[in-house]
């Protein structure tokens, strides 16, 4: 068994697709109309056959309060791994991405959190090698 698709609830599939492809450089894998919405998945260009990220409309009545509570408590909805957090932080800041926390060490990882403009906080994480520790 393996994870095939994971989802993130977004307030606008179009806006989310634009942010995640233009800022994070993810690629559209599937874009299939389904009623009022789309089955819209993205993949990392580093792993095009890997786990797909579904941009799930947050239309369910429970979604908005859940997302608002997570954001109010500064809890990231999900986490993406990067090789060089400091470089990615600077690249994204230069593209206008708003970070809610700057890069910081947390044990054997370094993390930073940004706002995806679609109602979520997203954590970037770099696993530190023995050289960094």
Go through the PLM ranges and name each one.
Residues 50-53, 57, 64:
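Short, charge-rich, low-complexity interaction segments located
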Residues 43-47, 114-117, 127:
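Active-site beta-strand termini and strand-to-loop segments that position acidic
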Residues 131-133:
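Conserved small/polar residues in nucleotide/adenosyl-binding loops
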Residues 52, 121-124:
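Short glycine-/small-residue motifs
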Residues 11-14, 60-121:
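Vicinal oxygen chelate
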Residues 1-3:
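Extreme N-terminal starter segment of soluble prokaryotic enzymes
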Residues 8-51:
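Core segments of cupin and vicinal oxygen chelate
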């Amino acid at each position: 068994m393996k994870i095939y698709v994971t989802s993130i609830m977004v307030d606008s599939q179009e806006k989310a697709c634009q942010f995640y492809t233009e800022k994070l450089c993810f690629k559209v894998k599937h874009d299939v109309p389904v009623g009022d919405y789309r089955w819209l998945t993205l993949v990392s260009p580093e792993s095009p056959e890997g786990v797909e990220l579904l941009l799930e409309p947050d239309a369910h009545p429970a979604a908005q309060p859940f997302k608002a509570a997570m954001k109010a408590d500064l809890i990231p909805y999900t986490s993406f791994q990067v090789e060089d957090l400091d470089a990615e932080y600077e690249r994204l800041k230069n593209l206008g991405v708003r970070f809610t926390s700057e890069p910081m060490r947390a044990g054997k990882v370094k993390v930073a959190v940004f706002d995806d403009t679609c109602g979520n906080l997203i954590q970037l994480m770099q696993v530190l090698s023995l050289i960094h520790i």
